Amino acid sequence: MTNIRKTHPLMKIINDTFIDLPTPSNISSWWNFGSLLGLCLIMQILTGLFLAMHYTPDTSTAFSSVAHICRDVNYGWFIRYLHANGASMFFICLYAHIGRSLYYGSYMFQETWNIGVLLLLTVMATAFVGYVLPWGQMSFWGATVITNLLSAIPYIGTTLVEWIWGGFSVDKATLTRFFAFHFILPFIITTLVAVHLLFLHETGSNNPMGIPSNMDMIPFHPYYTIKDILGALLLILALLTLTLFTPDLLGDPDNYTPANPLSTPAHIKPEWYFLFAYAILRSIPNKLGGVLALLLSILILIFIPMLQTSKQRSMMFRPFSQLLFWTLIADLLTLTWIGGQPVEHPYIIVGQLASILYFLLILVLMPTVSLIENKLLKW
């Protein structure tokens, strides 16, 4: 008799995705981040749902409703900090996942990669509108500054900003619609994740060597289910440590002050996971130029497959490309640091140099070095 998991229409989908899926035998722990992102998404949706039961998206009560969740709701403080720090964990996993794809050439699965870039943009949008909801000082001014960037668009800019605000400033209408966006976007993300997996399972996973994976495949269960459970336990351990010992480590103290349109914080800055893009934005004195650089810093990922000049897919056997890859990581960390600093000397020039290096590495240096490495293959 055939097993039910191989015949039942629903069970068959689960079986082909998580149980009998042929998987390369040599994928490393860098391939764990996909499942960790799935775990983060489920966790964020669940904690977010419980927070939404007590939150009120109204300018007069939003801040107090968050205080009420932390003080009066059973384990409300825990749910709130799990949700806030869960977002940080989400982005750590997301950046590790993208970094792994860049290093091992997984971007050559173009459909999977493009859906992934779309996912990144959607997650960033969700995190941005979510940060506005507690209605603290940084929520209000962050929303004002970032939405204001759209006014740099010629001709329609100002109208567009006022349309997004639902008025002439960030106010009640803005908060209400941002809550609506923050509620709906995770479900759009979930749908995109399904499409992402659909495209991935058309080709199968890449592997560290960058050679065809068909040579040596093993079933996903039990080999990679147990490996993913270990990754999940480590992620949960890290998240709980952060949430229970230093819940405000990654937050901004200004957000414990209720939003006040008449008082501007000394340093307006987004959450840490947007600081690298924020630093690139600030490095260009021209408003429109800054906005374009900000967009390009993320959208440049779409062009990565077109910039592949190497005959080898993975960087595993390409020491010069490896050097440039880790230089890029160091550059992104530098930009993240600069994004959190005030706009003054020497941070301005360091930020500008790091921004130039970021685009130079991706668009010029890495493709050029790959061509040189192709020549070295003949030695």
Swiss-Prot record:
The cytochrome bc1 complex contains 11 subunits: 3 respiratory subunits (MT-CYB, CYC1 and UQCRFS1), 2 core proteins (UQCRC1 and UQCRC2) and 6 low-molecular weight proteins (UQCRH/QCR6, UQCRB/QCR7, UQCRQ/QCR8, UQCR10/QCR9, UQCR11/QCR10 and a cleavage product of UQCRFS1). This cytochrome bc1 complex then forms a dimer. This is Cytochrome b. It comes from Globicephala melas. The chain crosses the membrane at residues 33-53, 77-98, 113-133, 178-198, 226-246, 288-308, 320-340, 347-367. PANTHER family: CYTOCHROME B (PTHR19271:SF16). GO terms for cellular component: mitochondrial inner membrane; respiratory chain complex III. Pfam families: Cytochrom_B_C, Cytochrome_B. Component of the ubiquinol-cytochrome c reductase complex (complex III or cytochrome b-c1 complex) that is part of the mitochondrial respiratory chain. The b-c1 complex mediates electron transfer from ubiquinol to cytochrome c. Contributes to the generation of a proton gradient across the mitochondrial membrane that is then used for ATP synthesis.
